[in-house]
Every structure is written in structure tokens, then in C-alpha cells.
Amino acid sequence: RLRVPLHVNLVEGYPVAPADELDMLVDERGAFKLDFLGLLIKGAGPQRAKLADQIERECAAQIARFVAEFPESRSGLIVDSHQHAHAIPVVFDALSTAARAQNCRISHMRIPEEKLSAYRACGRAADIGLANRAKCLILNRLSRRMRENLPRGCKAGPFCGVALSGSMDRM
């Protein structure tokens, strides 16, 4: 039986929740305005609580829409996000809270922790660009917090893909 994961999006396109309730997340056209780094910085700033509330509202709207289409997922929601935004503490916390509020049990969450030693072992470390190394370091740091705060019974499998992103065609 195929299970469909929810791919939460907070960084591209338009929200599911009313845009007029998400002024920290959307621009004047109602489109998402923050990327991963923007969410990370604002999530550590003085307006963290307001941002968390808006992220929670949008996550709840996305979960509700998803569960309406896939009601069986309520008892075992599989979650990840666009640009791995769910690794950001304010997003992770808001997403977890939104799932609980929607009476959804998160059974699996992608943790974007990538072991760069695997690339060294197979002779591919030189293929990892500086920007991708930085992304991996940031995501690995955030992933440790995620792992410590996963909902009870939630699983996270192995992950790879950030280190060589943008260069997969050279494989």
C-alpha cells in the first residue's frame, strides 16, 4: 500500500491559509517571501513568537487540506518540507504543534542530516561544492535538534541529496 507524504511548503508560491493572516510570511501579492535563510534568521529574532504563530497557522491549513484528500494519513503522517524548512527550529516546533492540533500523529519525518564521510569513503568528497558543504553543516546542526525533539514513535530514515545537489548530472 502506497503512503503519500505531506511536503510542507513555506518558501515558494502561495499559502493555503488566508494571506492577510500571514504578513511575516507573504509579500504584498500574497506570495511567500522568505527562503530557508530568511526563515532561519527571522525565527531566531525578536518576532519569533509572531512568526511561529503564522507558520503554525499555515502548517495547520496545509495539513487540513492534505488530510481531507488522504484521511488515512491522520494516524500516520509522513512529513518533509520544501528546502528542508522543517529543520528550522521555529518551523519544526510550529509544524509539530499544528499536527497535534489537527489530531494527526507524525509517524515519519525526514531529517536532512547527511554524513559527508560517506562521500569521502567513495572518493566523491571533491565533488561537493563550498555552498553545498555549508548547507550540509547547517542542516546537520539543525538535524541534531530535530532528532532530540521528534514526536514519540516518529521514525526518520537515512538521508542524502544535499551534498551533490546541483551536480547530479555529473554522476
Model-derived features: positions:
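Catalytic domains of cell-wall/extracellular-matrix polysaccharide-remodeling enzymes
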Residues: Q62-I63, V67-C154, F159, L164-D169
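Active-site gating loops and adjacent loop-to-helix segments of metal-dependent hydrolytic enzymes
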Residues: P15-A49
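Generic secondary-structure boundary/loop-capping signal
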Residues: H7, L22-D23, R29, A156-F159
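Short, flexible active-site-adjacent loop segments at beta-strand->alpha-helix junctions, enriched
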Residues: V8-L10, G38, A85, K115
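Surface-exposed loop/turn and secondary-structure junction residues enriched for glycine/proline
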Residues: V11-G13, L25-E28, I88-V90, S167
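Cap/lid and interdomain-hinge subdomains that line or gate substrate/regulatory clefts
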Residues: L40-E69
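Active-site beta->alpha N-cap acidic-glycine motif
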Residues: R1-G13
